[in-house]
Amino acid sequence: MSLTPQSNWQVWVGQLDLESDQCWQVAIGEKELHWHEFQDSFKCIAAAGGRVENEDDHILMIYRRDKWDLPKGKVDKGESIHQAAVREVMEECGLQYVERGVKLGVIYHMYFHKEKWVLKDTHWYKMRASKNEILIPQIEEDITAIEWVDPQTHPWKTNTFPSIEDVMSW
């Protein structure tokens, strides 16, 4: 499906296949002109998370809803994006101390929830934590396991989201 500057975003969004497992990538040529129009077709949610490394260069991954993922969550009212990233990592993994590093980038993804399309922008940060901390999965967020993984040898790639592969490569 292709889009032009004359496209009606809401019509385009309405034509997305809800049953499909496809990953959609949307490139907007004249970003300033069309981005707000595109966003208006969605309920927009800001989120933040971290690619957390330890002293062995292993990455902290969570297992949630049958997928390997990175810790992240919604930005609370009155909270900055970088504060949310640290808080979410600490809450979801039970960590007591996390050092926030540089911002890695932003990933946008769309999903259908409660009869409305949602556009979530997730801001990702590089972080560090100690491998000696006790990891406690946040069960109420459906996290069933947390592991420090060697990204080169652990089979996480066979069961994750395309966006997580992107963040892991940054």
Predicted regions: what they are:
Residues 1, 53-90:
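Conserved Nudix-box catalytic region and its N-terminal flanking loop in Nudix hydrolases
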Residues 75-163:
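Unchanged
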Residues 43-48, 65, 120-122:
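Short connector loops at helix/strand junctions that flank enzyme active sites
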Residues 3-49:
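Acidic, metal-coordinating catalytic segment for phosphate/diphosphate chemistry
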Residues 52-55, 127-129:
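Active-site beta-strand termini and strand-to-loop segments that position acidic
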Residues 49, 58, 145:
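Conserved beta-strand and immediately adjacent loop positions that scaffold enzyme active sites
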